[in-house]
């Protein structure tokens, strides 16, 4: 079911309309935001996603649970179409000046709702102030002519930012491009 959802013809045909050619799955993840979980700082995905030589991506967000302002739903900036990166901090989050110059809109969703946005859309989310978890599936696609880098992406991510169970004591892991805006503290 998962493969058909992310890489089936129905989904790829929809994404082809947005990237103007066949799309290739670049990466996917599920974000779990537990009650009290922190939000994600304002950022654009493009600076992180270009590390494999690609320039443009479209992300599909599928709500597993209801997304509300109380549980930290996605917020996007209301802006004209961007095709460049805004002013950023060293950690690739948007600078205070960039954030202050944007008008933010919460994207409240019901389970099963899809939200599609490209890699230049500024976005963020607030903390989960509710007493229920909020889960969201994110799948990011690039133009097929830019190449299939999914395996390389996850190999490199595991090398520089391994799961907790694979980390060695005393080693400092820097999330870098693999967790832009992520509120998780790294030890």
Regions found by a protein language model. Give the residues of each.
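A structural signal for short, well-ordered beta-strand segments
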Residues: 28-30, 60-62, 137-141
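A short beta-loop-beta micro-motif enriched in histidine and acidic residues
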Residues: 45-57, 102-103, 109-110, 132-133
């Amino acid at each position: 079911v998962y493969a058909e959802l992310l890489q089936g013809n129905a989904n790829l045909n929809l994404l082809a309309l947005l990237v103007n050619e066949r799309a290739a799955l670049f990466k996917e993840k599920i974000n779990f935001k537990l009650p009290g979980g922190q939000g994600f700082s304002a950022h654009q995905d493009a600076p992180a996603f270009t590390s494999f030589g690609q320039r443009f991506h479209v992300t599909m967000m599928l709500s597993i649970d209801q997304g509300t302002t109380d549980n930290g739903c996605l917020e996007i900036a209301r802006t004209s179409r961007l095709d460049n990166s805004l002013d950023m901090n060293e950690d690739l989050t948007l600078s205070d000046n960039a954030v202050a110059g944007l008008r933010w809109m919460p994207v409240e969703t019901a389970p099963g709702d899809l939200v599609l946005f490209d890699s230049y859309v500024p976005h963020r989310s607030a903390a989960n102030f509710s007493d229920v978890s909020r889960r969201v599936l994110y799948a990011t696609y690039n133009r097929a002519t830019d190449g299939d880098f999914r395996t390389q992406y996850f190999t490199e991510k595991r090398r520089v930012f391994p799961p907790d169970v694979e980390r060695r004591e005393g080693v400092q892991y820097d999330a870098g491009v693999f967790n832009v805006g992520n509120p998780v503290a790294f030890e």
